[in-house]
């Protein structure tokens, strides 16, 4: 019996065939090469095409309201990755759209959601601050009431895709005297508002992220999400979705999309490296052992679920990519048209940071899965402060 391919019903097989043909038409070699060169992880033409075809809306909606079935959703995720679709920022947009739906006013929902699902609006995250690290609750970006609106001042790091987005899901401090989890308010800030400045930052893997500055940015109260000083409730919902700690559905097909797609890149990179070696080299016991060990590690990481998979995949990419460079020798450090080892090596560094650092995830596993206490960051007795 062949377990390499799942037998689909006629409806799902047709869905897969149509989706595969659609992606082959819009995700061209030029799109993939341009995305690799720019590091944007986004292509507006592809995004608008997906919106016009109704795929974005069906991905966002629950099945009961016209969204994908569980099997179709899995097909969708796999085909998106298979086509190398510049895609990672849709997960952010969809997550923020959920927050707008759950916590926004009717007026804000009407303004944002329809154009988001058509692909015309994109949404990004404004959590981390230049000096804040992973603890986003230490927010210093201030929002102060001004009549029936708000004035915002501050800055945010890692506002990825802000240069293609229309709104930022912005965490602000509205009550500096209160405990940090009771001082926060969330806003959906239009990025074309006066006083917003988006500046690029290049990561070691060639991706583009941004730092955004907010200087006397004035917005109406209708852009507030949730209660004043109740932003932690709004934020926790989004963070649980980003970290993959909440149940996505009842089918067990939860998936941290970015991690899985990068694991598939590792699989392709491994194949490219093996194919680039002369037959005599591959036949050497030491090389065959290292390639085989890499395959086993990659397969184990891909099959690891939830939070554990997030750690396993990022760790595998970080540890296996230098192994592949070493096997290739001097050529392993050179860029090429193929998916080369040096690209995977550079990709592995930020992969352990975005979506929540590996340290944060290990602490989450320790607390929520193993039942251990919260981590203690205080210096040991007698140690240096």
Predicted segments — roles?
Residues 3, 71, 76, 234-237, ...:
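Glycine-rich phosphate/cofactor-binding loops in nucleotide/flavin-utilizing enzymes
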Residues 31-38, 288, 292-340:
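C-terminal helix-coil-helix/basic helical segment that borders enzyme active sites and/or dimer interfaces
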Residues 52-119, 161-167, 298, 302-309, ...:
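Internal helix-loop-helix
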Residues 141-144:
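A structural signal for short hydrophobic beta-strand segments in well-ordered beta-sheet cores
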Residues 153-197:
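A short core secondary-structure module
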């Amino acid at each position: 019996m062949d377990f390499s391919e799942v037998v689909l019903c006629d409806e799902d097989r047709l869905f897969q065939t149509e989706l595969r043909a659609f992606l082959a038409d819009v995700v061209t070699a030029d799109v993939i090469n341009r995305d690799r060169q720019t590091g944007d992880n986004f292509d507006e033409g592809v995004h608008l095409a997906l919106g016009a075809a109704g795929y974005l809306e069906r991905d966002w909606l629950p099945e009961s309201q016209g969204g994908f079935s569980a099997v179709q959703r899995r097909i969708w995720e796999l085909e998106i990755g298979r086509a190398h679709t510049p895609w990672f920022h849709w997960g952010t947009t969809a997550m923020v759209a959920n927050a707008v739906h759950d916590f926004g006013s009717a007026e804000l929902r009407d303004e944002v959601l329809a154009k988001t699902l058509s692909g015309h609006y994109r949404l990004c995250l404004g959590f981390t601050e230049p000096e804040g690290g992973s603890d986003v609750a230490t927010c210093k970006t201030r929002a102060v009431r001004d009549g029936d609106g708000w004035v915002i001042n501050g800055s945010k790091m890692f506002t990825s895709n802000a240069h293609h987005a229309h709104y930022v899901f912005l965490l602000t401090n509205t009550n500096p005297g209160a405990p940090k989890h009771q001082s926060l308010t969330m806003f959906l800030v239009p990025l074309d508002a006066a006083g917003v400045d988006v500046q690029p930052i290049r990561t070691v893997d060639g991706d583009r992220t941004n730092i955004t500055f907010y200087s006397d940015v004035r917005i109406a109260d209708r852009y507030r999400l949730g209660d004043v000083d109740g932003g932690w409730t709004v934020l926790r919902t989004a963070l649980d979705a980003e970290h993959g700690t909440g149940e996505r559905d009842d089918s067990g097909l939860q998936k941290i999309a970015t991690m899985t797609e990068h694991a598939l890149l590792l699989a392709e990179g491994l194949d490219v490296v093996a194919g680039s070696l002369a037959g005599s080299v591959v036949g050497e016991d030491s090389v065959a052992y290292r390639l085989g060990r890499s395959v086993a590690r990659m397969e184990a990481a891909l099959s690891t679920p939830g939070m554990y998979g997030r750690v396993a995949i990022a760790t595998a990419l970080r540890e296996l990519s230098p192994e592949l460079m070493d096997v290739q020798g001097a050529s392993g450090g050179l860029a090429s048209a193929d998916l080369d080892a040096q690209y995977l090596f550079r990709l592995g560094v930020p992969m352990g940071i975005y979506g929540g650092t590996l340290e944060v995830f290990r602490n989450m596993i320790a607390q929520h899965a193993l039942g251990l206490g919260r981590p203690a960051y205080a210096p040991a007795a007698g140690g240096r402060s």
